[in-house]
């Protein structure tokens, strides 16, 4: 992640890596990221296609490729091709991240149940290539959405539709939303939100991605808040509760330390788990 942050400032063609850094900062938390690996995350996606892998999402969107070694040979595949590859006896050794010119605009989102240390309910990433002379005309598009099903990766019909069109016009937007709604494959996933919610969320992220990219002068003021990143604009929330006691009623509700408090704080308390395992020991639990 630090390499992404450094490269984004030193090399213009990797300017977009700062956005990957910001997205990866939402993945798990620091201790998990320190012991986890990129290849391990991708292999989880390979084994569990419904897993909403942020790393897979980002790499597939930016056209990254994976170098996979098998015995004396190696093969270079896209993340999507990797999902259908038999990985028995194979190892991911490299990830190639391509440079992108200033014509490309990248934006990504991760919808989580909590602000940190939570997997994505729905995640989405968009990469648009715009014409140098007509800034609102899309030359190519990559629309990747995760968390919907194990079968859906690219919104290919929508990608083809927006090419050579002025994507910031309402007519094109409405048609693109209809096409996207028709091609999304959403399935029931155990432990995840209902398919109806995840489908609406995916459509909303497509719209929000365009709000982020559209020049502000072309956007009506009441729509601008839709592009706002609340994590960056809202201050941290905080709260406190104070429980008062009335000395007149003491010793009822009088604050006092419990008997074991000092030895517990000092680490001197002896618990059942501290005892040595005995022969024929039986474990039980109250249910």
Task: Outline where the language-model segments fall.
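Short acidic-hydrophobic catalytic motif
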Residues: 242-279, 285
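Short, well-ordered beta-strand elements within core beta-sheets of diverse protein domains
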Residues: 160-161, 283-287
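C-terminal structural segment of proteins
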Residues: 1-252, 258-261
């Amino acid at each position: 992640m630090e390499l992404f942050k450094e490269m984004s400032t030193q090399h213009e063609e990797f300017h977009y890596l700062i956005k990957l850094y910001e997205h990866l900062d939402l993945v798990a938390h620091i201790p998990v990221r320190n012991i986890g690996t990129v290849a391990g995350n991708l292999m989880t996606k390979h084994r569990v296609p419904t897993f909403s892998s942020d790393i897979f999402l980002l790499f597939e969107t930016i056209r990254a490729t994976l170098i996979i070694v098998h015995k004396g040979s190696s093969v270079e595949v896209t993340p999507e091709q990797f999902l259908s590859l038999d990985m028995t006896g194979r190892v991911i050794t490299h990830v190639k991240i391509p440079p992108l010119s200033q014509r490309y605009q990248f934006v990504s989102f991760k919808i989580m149940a909590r602000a940190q240390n939570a997997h994505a309910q729905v995640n989405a990433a968009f990469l648009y290539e715009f014409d140098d002379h007509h800034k609102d005309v899309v030359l190519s598009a990559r629309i990747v959405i995760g968390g919907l099903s194990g079968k859906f990766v690219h919104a290919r019909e929508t990608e083809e539709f927006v090419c050579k069109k002025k994507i910031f016009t309402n007519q094109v937007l409405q048609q693109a939303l209809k096409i996207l709604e028709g091609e999304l494959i959403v399935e029931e996933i155990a432990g995840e939100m209902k398919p109806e919610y995840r489908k609406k969320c995916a459509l909303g992220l497509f719209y929000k991605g365009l709000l982020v990219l559209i020049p502000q002068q072309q956007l009506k003021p009441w729509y601008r808040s839709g592009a706002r990143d609340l994590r960056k604009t809202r201050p941290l929330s905080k709260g406190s509760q104070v429980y008062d006691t009335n000395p007149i009623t003491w010793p009822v509700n009088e604050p006092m330390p419990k008997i074991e408090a000092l030895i517990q704080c000092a680490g001197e308390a002896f618990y059942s788990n501290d005892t040595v395992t005995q022969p024929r020991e039986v474990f039980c639990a109250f249910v």
